[in-house]
Amino acid sequence: MAHHEEHKKVELTKKKLVDVMKHVDICMMTTVAATGRLHSRPMSNNKDVEWDGDTWFFAYADSSQVQEIAANSNVNLGYSRPDKIIFVSLTGSGVIVHDLAKKKELWYKALDFWFPNGPEDPAVVLIRVAGQYAYYWSKEGEGDLDL
């Protein structure tokens, strides 16, 4: 029988959560499909280091994630830094945002690859995930935080 050590509890703070998220550009966004199955895909969180509880993503209005969030707002974001043995699961509520000023504010040059018509393209929308709960694992231990 394998020996199992209980992970020690660590205090997860918003500052620690921001520090992990700002070093991980790509997270796995999980939404609920019409079939009820969980549907995950990689998404860039734009390294939003001034995190206030909301995480922003760009997507096309006709994409699966936008359609799924419109039908069921439950979203999970999975962040991973295996090199540092740090993992975060962030649960929240997603909403689709059609705000040109916000798109321009969050836009950065690398997005031109995915969205060649720029932030003015009406087919490009924002997904805002309002964080509600986070769980953190690291080599020091694990902890959670209600947001």
Role assignments for model-derived ranges:
Residues 2-12, 90-147:
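Charged, gly/pro-rich active-site loop segments
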Residues 5-8, 34-35, 54-56:
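Short, flexible loop segments at the rims of nucleotide/cofactor-binding pockets, characterized by
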Residues 7-24:
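Short, basic/aromatic recognition patches
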Residues 19-35, 75-79:
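A short, Trp-centered hydrophobic/proline-enriched beta-strand micro-motif
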Residues 25, 41, 51-53, 71-75, ...:
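A generic structural signal for short beta-strands and their flanking turns/coil linkers
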Residues 28, 54-56, 135:
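General beta-strand recognition
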Residues 33-37, 44-47:
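A glycine-rich, hydrophobic loop/mini-helix early in the fold
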Residues 46-84:
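A short mixed-secondary-structure module that forms the rim of ligand-binding clefts
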